Amino acid sequence: MKLLPKILALSLAMVVTTSVAANQLANEKTAISVNYKNNRYPLLQKPYIELPIGSIRPTGWMQEQLVRMKNGMTGNLDQVYEKVMGPRNGWLGGDGDVWERGPYWIDGLLPLAYILNDQALIDKVKPWVEWTLASQKPNGYFGPDTDRSYEPGLQRDNSRDWWPKMVMMKVMQQYYSATGDTRVIDFFTRYFKYQLAELPQNPLGKWTFWGEQRGGDNLMVVYWLYNITGDKFLLDLGELIHKQTFNWTDIFLNQDHLSRQLSLHCVNLAQGFKEPVVYYQQNQDPKQICAVKKAVKDIHNTIGLPTGLWGGDELLRFGEPTTGSELCTAVEMMFSLEEMLEITGDVQWADYLERVAYNALPTQVTDDYSARQYYQQT
């Protein structure tokens, strides 16, 4: 189950914090700035650089939307969904939900809090951040580590799964972007050393297939840290994570998944879409870019919908008028397109992003952000 706060904060906060052009100096295709870090060699230089969270303050319509989110479910999910997001949550040290749902909420709430500079929201976010930092063990592992018996409405098993940690990594990356808290750098360095040692024996797909199919989310944070520290082991880890991740490049170039119903999970496709481009920064093989461009064409002819998304009620469906598309698919595809635009500078991805943002997304939430529709029909 994906959650409204993560969905909306991620997609709307994108408008005020996403990648923007930095100073264009010697090479018009490369963003160079003394204030913000581009990719460190040997990673491919990016034409756009993401500004820190909070460096741009919303006004007008955008501010109104974010305030509505604050007053809606995004800012109040700990009350609306207290069983999962309350003090029993495993990411607060409790005996309740230990998987993705808590991190997903904070993935949206944290940027919303710091973009609005809203102390009440920041106070809600900080216990999750502080518990996560304090949970790290000497070997680098972090997060819940105890599986418990089933309880209706809660996910209390697979506590050591790699996937929910990928969501929390994104939370911690955003926290650093907003605050500059240097504890985050040591936290990630220790965790990535743990991953490098642990993944050969316990790969991304050991506990669930989600980590294997969404490994690109892990990979992008590894590169982010490498650009800050320059630690060479991170490049080795990048290769290992890519190798263990579902081979989206081959899926897009050589296989027929996009012409078969039920072949993939619809949100995994949206999240996996960026992985070839994220990895392209390290291996710089043009086939990674060719793969995602081919995928766009294939989707248009089979499972695609006019919104730019695809049919999928969990699993892929052909793009027929009666076929639904998940709200989760919309925002995860938007995030993938943001990353792809930042890395390549190709305005094709900006156009695609706009198409999804203004056609798919608005139909699936109420104006006051108090409710959302899981599936939409075109």
Segments the model singles out, each with a brief description of its role:
Residues I7, A22-N23:
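Non-catalytic N-terminal targeting/anchoring module and adjacent flexible stem/linker
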Residues N23-T378:
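Glycan-recognition and catalytic cores of secretory/periplasmic carbohydrate-active enzymes
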Residues A9-T17:
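Bacterial N-terminal signal peptides
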Residues M1-L8:
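Bacterial N-terminal signal peptides that target proteins for export
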Residues K2, V15, T245-F246:
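Hydrophobic transmembrane signal anchors and adjacent membrane-proximal interface regions, especially
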